[in-house]
């Protein structure tokens, strides 16, 4: 064989090996996404660009074996997680309810009352979105997972308290996680240390459990790198100095991806790193993580006000109406100040393709925060749509020794 043929064969073999080692990059290049979205790939630091793709291989017992592929090495550079923190909080809320159930008999559907004990706190005795017309932990969780409801998040934050949230996340192995704020512009960092009293009720007069007001005087600064974001902060039409997010919520993006995996595939994690949830808890989470807003009866959402893609970025992008519900995204998203993120477990119930994909982007060309001028629709959502389709196509064509049994989730989105 001539030398040049040997060289060509060697180069081709090396390229195949590289593609096999970096499946994610192989998928991206195969669909020319690195060309179409070249700015992201040329300046990954500028765009806080992170992608984590998890391949799922089933064995003969349908047990999932996970293999993660990173586009870039994980880092602790600060990004604003926004609503991504809702996923660990809904799991922690169910954990806490289960522990209280053993003593007081309360459940996620038990009626509750929220009182106030410090500035910026508000009371709540009724909830018109709930089937019972009363507030419940379960209904707050539904609102968070269906439409990323910030008010409901703040109530779950108050129920859990920041001390409990961070202690428990650290116990689970997420040592750099720091959740220390409501999503309420009227509450400053001091007010967020104080949480409301909660009362759980069997009826108008019978109290099952009282949770007193709480305060947390521990250090709430996060450990992220470079917590000053942007070149300025826009407020009252004026550009003010860059804001320091040292006392805001933070969770490494890798941790957020792992939390999703631990909820979808708990048995792939050691017991010490799993949420202590029941089978019913997991099914409840899967149902409302994958449901479209219009599919929910309680709470009820009109599609014209809450489009299908409200919190479905990967694969669906800017598609307001999703017609093919055989493809489901069980996910959590974040969007604020130019940051756009989605962490999802995706399934196709027809082809039985499944995978997890997490994407983080910073889309703020002016690098001014709080001016509302971000490139979500020009770059972010189209990229997440295209990458989602590229990975789904790859998974649909993949030869599998054992097909995943998706029966445990296929029935979850019947009318609720």
Residue ranges of predicted features:
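Bacterial Sec-dependent N-terminal signal peptides
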Residues: 1-25
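Active-site-adjacent helix/loop patches that line small-molecule binding or acyl-intermediate pockets
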Residues: 21-33, 46, 116, 121-124, ...
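Structured C-terminal helix/loop/strand segments within mature extracytoplasmic catalytic/sensor domains
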Residues: 21-37, 41-43, 235-416
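A short, well-structured edge-of-sheet supersecondary motif
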Residues: 31-73, 357-359
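Extracytoplasmic
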Residues: 46-49, 74-76, 80-85, 107-109, ...
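Acidic helix-start/capping segments at beta-turn-to-alpha-helix junctions
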Residues: 54-57, 105-125, 160-161, 182-190, ...
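Active-site SXXK
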Residues: 80-107, 112, 357
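Short glycine/serine- and small hydrophobic-enriched flexible loop segments
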Residues: 91-99, 146, 150, 258-265, ...
């Amino acid at each position: 064989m001539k030398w040049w043929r040997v060289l060509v064969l060697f180069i081709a073999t090396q390229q195949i090996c590289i593609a096999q080692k970096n499946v994610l990059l192989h998928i991206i290049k195969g669909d020319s996404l690195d060309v179409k979205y070249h700015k992201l790939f040329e300046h990954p630091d500028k765009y806080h660009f992170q992608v984590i793709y998890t391949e799922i291989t089933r064995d003969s017992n349908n047990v999932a074996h996970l293999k993660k592929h990173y586009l870039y090495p994980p880092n602790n550079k600060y990004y604003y997680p926004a609503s991504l923190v809702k996923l660990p909080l809904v799991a922690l809320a169910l954990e806490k309810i289960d522990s209280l159930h053993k003593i007081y008999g309360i459940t996620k559907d038990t009626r509750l009352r929220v009182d106030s004990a410090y500035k910026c706190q508000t009371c709540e005795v009724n909830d018109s979105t709930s089937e019972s017309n009363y507030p419940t932990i379960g209904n707050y969780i539904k609102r968070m997972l269906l439409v990323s409801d910030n008010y409901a998040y703040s109530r779950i934050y108050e129920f859990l308290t920041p001390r409990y949230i961070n202690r428990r996340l650290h116990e689970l192995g997420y040592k750099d996680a720091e959740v220390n704020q409501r999503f309420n512009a009227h509450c400053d960092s001091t007010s967020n240390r104080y949480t409301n009293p909660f009362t759980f009720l069997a009826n108008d007069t019978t109290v099952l459990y009282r949770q007193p007001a709480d305060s947390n005087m521990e250090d709430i600064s996060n450990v992220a790198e470079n917590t000053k974001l942007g070149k300025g902060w826009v407020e009252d039409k004026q550009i003010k100095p860059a804001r320091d997010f040292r006392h805001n919520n933070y969770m490494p993006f890798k941790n957020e991806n792992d939390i999703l995996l631990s909820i979808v595939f708990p048995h792939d994690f050691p017991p010490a790193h799993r949420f202590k949830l029941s089978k019913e808890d997991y099914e409840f989470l899967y149902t409302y993580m994958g449901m479209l807003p219009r599919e929910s009866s309680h709470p009820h959402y009109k599609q014209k006000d809450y489009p299908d893609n409200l919190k479905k970025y990967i694969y669906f992008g800017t598609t307001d109406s999703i017609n093919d519900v055989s493809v489901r995204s069980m996910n959590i998203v974040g969007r604020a100040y130019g940051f756009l993120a989605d962490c999802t477990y995706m399934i196709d119930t027809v082809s039985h393709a499944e995978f997890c994909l997490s994407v983080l982007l910073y889309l703020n060309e002016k690098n001014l925060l709080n001016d509302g001028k971000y490139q979500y629709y020009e770059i972010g959502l189209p990229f997440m749509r295209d990458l989602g389709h590229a990975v789904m196509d790859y998974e649909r064509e993949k030869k599998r020794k054992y097909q995943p049994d998706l029966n445990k989730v296929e029935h979850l989105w019947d009318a609720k």
